[in-house]
């Protein structure tokens, strides 16, 4: 018999390319499996396939997980400046002398979890 997995309150923020955001809270497994993350995240991405990005989140001042449409740039989705700042913050924390505009950007909607959820 399979053991029940522990569910914990989990907050996440959906950031649109227009800069608007919506905060959500759900109960999810403490260590969710890929399919659980996919079924939660991909609807926010307009059905796009999720791609994981480890980020240094300024809200938490700690490392956490962001998910974006893996084909966002190829689909020519609009640049998401708010998500790009979070994404680039990770690089700039380690390499402060780099030019941030030479780094990749986030295209389309992004989903940022306020706790680490990715085991990969």
Give residue spans per PLM region.
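Detector for the mature cores of small, proteolytically processed
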Residues: 4-39, 44-120
């Amino acid at each position: 018999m399979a053991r029940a997995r522990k569910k914990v309150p989990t907050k996440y923020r959906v950031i649109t390319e227009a800069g608007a955001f919506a905060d959500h809270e759900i109960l999810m497994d403490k260590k969710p499996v890929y399919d659980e993350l996919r079924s939660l995240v991909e609807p926010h991405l307009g059905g796009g396939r999720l791609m994981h990005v480890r980020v240094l989140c300024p809200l938490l001042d700690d490392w956490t997980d962001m998910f974006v449409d893996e084909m966002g740039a190829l689909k020519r989705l609009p640049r998401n400046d708010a998500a790009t700042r979070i994404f680039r913050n990770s690089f700039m924390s380690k390499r402060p002398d780099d030019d941030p505009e030479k780094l990749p950007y986030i295209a389309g909607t992004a989903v940022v979890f306020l706790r680490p959820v990715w085991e990969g």
